[in-house]
């Protein structure tokens, strides 16, 4: 069972240099929700690193290839119950961490919207337009070079992001930089060797657009990558035992731990260098 966090509340701060001339280049690339010209309540800070063309990458997810079709799938008879199933697995892990929260690889903003994540970034501008309409404050950037100041986020979410990342160690270094004391990383992924991951791995092997560069990990491999990057896994949940290709899907309950055959796994981890000195706010029993 996951217990609610007693992490220190993050103090509000200003978006650094928002009105300064130095920030004009990055302001031009920020995609704020419609009608919003300034960040509300200044929960978090942008730094003055402009997202220049050399820090941008080609679309690194299926959402970047065809954002409209990708987003519409979540409203389909298949997509709706699967989305609800995956969100139910992620929610208890991310809700224990303080605001503000950031999603790396936010895509069209489906998960951010449902999980209370206010900030997101993605290399696909097309996908970000959907996220912006959902009220997410977004930036056209990649997880290896995040335009936010350090130690300001209570949680960083990566849902279906790591399989498209070429350098996991780099993105984990940035995540550690971004997390405030007591904050945590929450990852949702398709474990290699399960029917759903195998389906997308086959598409990747065939060079299908949007999947060509995908790489999948087992839970053990991912946990080792996290450990090598200075994280400690503190909770695990799994769901989605229904295989691909069914005519109808039901919303599944999530279970603590990792079960054989589960098509979706959610993991939360904390930076070992910045854990609370007493008991940790997250516990798995």
Swiss-Prot record:
Induction: A member of the dormancy regulon. Induced in response to reduced oxygen tension (hypoxia), low levels of nitric oxide (NO) and carbon monoxide (CO). It is hoped that this regulon will give insight into the latent, or dormant phase of infection. It holds the Pfam family Methyltransf_11. Belongs to the methyltransferase superfamily. GO terms for molecular function: methyltransferase activity; S-adenosylmethionine-dependent methyltransferase activity. It comes from Mycobacterium tuberculosis (strain ATCC 25618 / H37Rv). The lineage of its organism: Bacteria, Bacillati, Actinomycetota, Actinomycetes, Mycobacteriales. It comes from the Bacteria. Coiled coil: none annotated. This is Uncharacterized protein Rv2003c. InterPro entries: Methyltransf_11 (IPR013216), SAM-dependent_MTases_sf (IPR029063).
């Amino acid at each position: 069972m996951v217990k609610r966090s007693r992490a220190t509340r993050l103090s509000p701060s200003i978006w650094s240099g928002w009105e300064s001339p130095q920030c004009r280049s990055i302001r031009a690339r920020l995609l704020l929700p419609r009608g919003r010209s300034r960040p509300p309540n200044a929960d978090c800070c942008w730094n003055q690193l402009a997202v220049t063309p050399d820090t941008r990458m080609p679309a690194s997810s299926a959402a970047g290839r065809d954002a409209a079709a990708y987003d519409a799938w979540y409203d389909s008879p298949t997509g709706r119950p699967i989305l609800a199933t995956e969100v139910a697995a992620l929610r208890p892990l991310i809700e224990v961490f303080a605001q503000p929260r950031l999603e790396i690889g936010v895509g069209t903003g489906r998960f951010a919207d449902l999980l209370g994540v206010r900030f997101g970034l993605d290399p696909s501008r097309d996908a970000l337009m959907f996220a912006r309409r959902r009220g997410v404050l977004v930036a056209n950037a990649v997880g290896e070079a995040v335009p936010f100041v350090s130690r300001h986020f209570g949680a960083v979410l990566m849902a279906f992001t790591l399989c498209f990342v070429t350098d996991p160690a780099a993105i984990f270094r940035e995540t550690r930089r971004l997390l405030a004391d007591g904050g945590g990383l929450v990852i949702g992924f398709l474990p290699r060797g399960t029917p759903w991951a195998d389906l997308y791995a086959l598409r990747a092997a065939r060079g299908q657009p949007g999947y060509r560069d995908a790489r999948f990990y087992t839970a053990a491999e991912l946990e080792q990558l996290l450990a090598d990057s200075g994280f400690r896994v503190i909770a695990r949940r799994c769901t989605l035992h229904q295989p691909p290709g069914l005519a109808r899907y039901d919303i599944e309950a999530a279970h603590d731990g990792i079960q054989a055959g589960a098509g979706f796994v959610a993991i939360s981890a904390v930076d070992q260098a910045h854990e609370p000195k007493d008991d940790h706010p997250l516990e798995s029993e």
